[in-house]
Amino acid sequence: MHELLLFASVPAHQHHELLQQLAGLTAMQPQHRLERRLVFKAYRKPGLVNVRVGASQDLQGAELQRLNKMLNGGMFYTQVVGPVSEADFGAPASPVADQDAHMSGTDEKLSVRTHYYDYENQPWKLEFRDIPEAATRSAVTARLMSSASLPKGDITVPMNAWGYNFVTEYAVEGDIFIHNDIVIFLHRVLHYPTESQEPRRQLPALNEMTPLDRSGGYVLQAAITVQDGGNQETMKIASQHLFGLREQLKSAVRLEQADRLSLDTRAK
């Protein structure tokens, strides 16, 4: 699959107004999204990865095929993405089941009201993004992409077995809009207050997270996924749709092609 994209910087003071404009353009309310994004780096040469390990036994055949293709294609940085909610930030880790069973009636009522972050049941998906093409067909960012479901919970063991080491993690907060075949994501990157050598089992309070852009700015990303990147006509039509959106939003933001090397995912 191919992904075609345009990007724009959005100052903090313009965020609310742009949300309203996008809601009017797409005739929908924004869908708020919070994601954990774990960054892994390949340390093993392609062709040596066997995805049939450990928790991956629960994955369907089609997912395993996609994983094989992604993980054996070359040495890249790749992201493992998991959806979370605002309530997960600052929530205590999920207690052990046998401890719950011995709670008194009062404690049981309290536990119902308490939200826990259950890391062991955190869903994940692997997102592969190639370095954007050097000679694009038009003034859009074009790159190969793929994604596949992963086992829930602690993902480091299977990722290590597949030849990937954990590097770091961050969070993304934003709002999604759908405009015909375009996915519009107005978002910002959030850093954790401290570094960790492994994925966190408990998340800090959301107000402890710091924006990557200290000015409070956001990024507007407009993306179209094309199943057959070799079909020139389909790619041309997708590009034209992005240009149409750029024209509709030109009074508010400047959608443009990203710098290719800033999106380089190759592991050096």
UniProtKB/Swiss-Prot annotation:
GO biological process: regulation of transcription by RNA polymerase II; termination of RNA polymerase II transcription
Protein origin, superkingdom: Eukaryota
Gene3D superfamilies per UniProt: Hypothetical Protein Pfu-838710-001
Sorted UniProt keywords: Activator, Nucleus, Transcription, Transcription regulation
GO cellular component: core mediator complex; mediator complex
Pfam families: Med18
InterPro entries according to UniProt: Mediator_Med18 (IPR019095)
Annotated S-S bridges: none
Compartments where located: Nucleus
GO molecular function, one term: transcription coregulator activity
Function: Component of the Mediator complex, a coactivator involved in the regulated transcription of nearly all RNA polymerase II-dependent genes. Mediator functions as a bridge to convey information from gene-specific regulatory proteins to the basal RNA polymerase II transcription machinery. Mediator is recruited to promoters by direct interactions with regulatory proteins and serves as a scaffold for the assembly of a functional preinitiation complex with RNA polymerase II and the general transcription factors.
Family the UniProt entry places it in: Belongs to the Mediator complex subunit 18 family.
Subunit description: Component of the Mediator complex.
UniProt protein name: Mediator of RNA polymerase II transcription subunit 18
UniProt source species: Neosartorya fischeri (strain ATCC 1020 / DSM 3700 / CBS 544.65 / FGSC A1164 / JCM 1740 / NRRL 181 / WB 181) (Aspergillus fischerianus)
Lineage, opening ranks: Eukaryota, Fungi, Dikarya, Ascomycota, Pezizomycotina
Chain's gene name: srb5
